[in-house]
């Protein structure tokens, strides 16, 4: 298959400031594209140029960084506007088999839904309205733009919370799909311990402590298992 993955925001900003990085190969979306590539698919990744690494890299597949415009209104850390996505998709709409885009509340996702509606798959992580400007832009988008112009796209939620949210606005919503695995690890560790680890940045939105508490509650009813576990984050 020929797959185009559109993920303008490659990693989380810090208070609106996009950090400078030396590589994008540690991002979740790069691992996903690499998995497609290793499975024999022809994959291209589109991202905002604001997230390009400081030094030039060699990639296993095509990576296209496109310029964002109107940055004062369409902040690259929140809602980047990449007009080059329209041109890129128009030139390849007859050849591509699937366009995988990030979030329904996204201009590139709208472009994909207009150009190749039946080939567009959108993964939905958000389970609530964006709080910018008292949620009005988000509410207008989901109630009008998404309902009118993005109805034919297939929506894949990342959680049951996001599934319940997006079902209020979109007709074609699938079942949640969880995280995959990192495909670059080539051998298992021989000195493994019974541990439960959560790996990630401690943003309050991620609610990491709830994962720890729920796993601890799960083990509390299984004393024979819990005694062998170290729980930490």
Where are these regions (language model features)?
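Short His-centered aromatic/hydrophobic patch
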Residues: 101-107, 124
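Membrane-proximal helix-turn-helix segments that form the acceptor-binding/catalytic region
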Residues: 30-34, 90, 114, 128, ...
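A short, active-site helix/loop in glycosyltransferases that binds the activated sugar's phosphate group
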Residues: 49-54, 146-174, 181-185
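Acceptor-binding helix/loop patch of EC 2.4 sugar-transfer enzymes
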Residues: 12-16, 68-73, 120-148
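A short, charged, and often flexible helix/loop element on the N-terminal side
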Residues: 59-87, 129-131, 137
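N-terminal subdomain of nucleotide-sugar transferases
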Residues: 1-51, 94
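Conserved donor-binding/catalytic core segment of Leloir-type glycosyltransferases
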Residues: 4, 156, 188-206, 211-217, ...
């Amino acid at each position: 298959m020929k797959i185009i993955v559109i993920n303008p925001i490659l990693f989380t900003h810090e208070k609106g400031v996009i950090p400078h990085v030396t590589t994008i190969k540690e991002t979740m979306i790069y691992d996903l594209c690499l998995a497609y590539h290793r499975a024999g698919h022809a994959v291209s990744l589109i991202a905002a140029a604001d997230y390009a690494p400081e030094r030039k890299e060699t990639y296993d597949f095509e990576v296209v960084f496109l310029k964002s415009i109107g940055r004062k209104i369409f902040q690259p850390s929140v809602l980047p506007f990449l007009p080059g996505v329209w041109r890129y998709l128009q030139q390849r709409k007859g050849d591509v088999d699937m366009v995988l885009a990030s979030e329904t509340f996204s201009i590139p996702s709208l472009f994909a839904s207009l150009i190749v509606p039946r080939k567009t798959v959108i993964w939905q992580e958000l389970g609530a309205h964006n709080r910018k400007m008292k949620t009005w832009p988000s509410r207008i988008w989901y109630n009008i733009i998404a309902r009118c112009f993005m109805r034919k796209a297939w929506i894949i939620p990342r959680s049951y919370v996001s599934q319940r949210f997006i079902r209020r606005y979109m007709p074609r919503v699938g079942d949640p799909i969880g995280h995959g695995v990192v495909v670059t690890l080539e051998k298992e560790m021989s000195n493994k311990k019974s541990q439960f680890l959560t790996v990630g940045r401690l943003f309050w939105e991620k609610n990491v402590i709830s994962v720890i508490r729920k796993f601890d509650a799960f083990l509390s009813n299984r004393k024979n298992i819990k005694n062998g576990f170290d729980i930490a984050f």
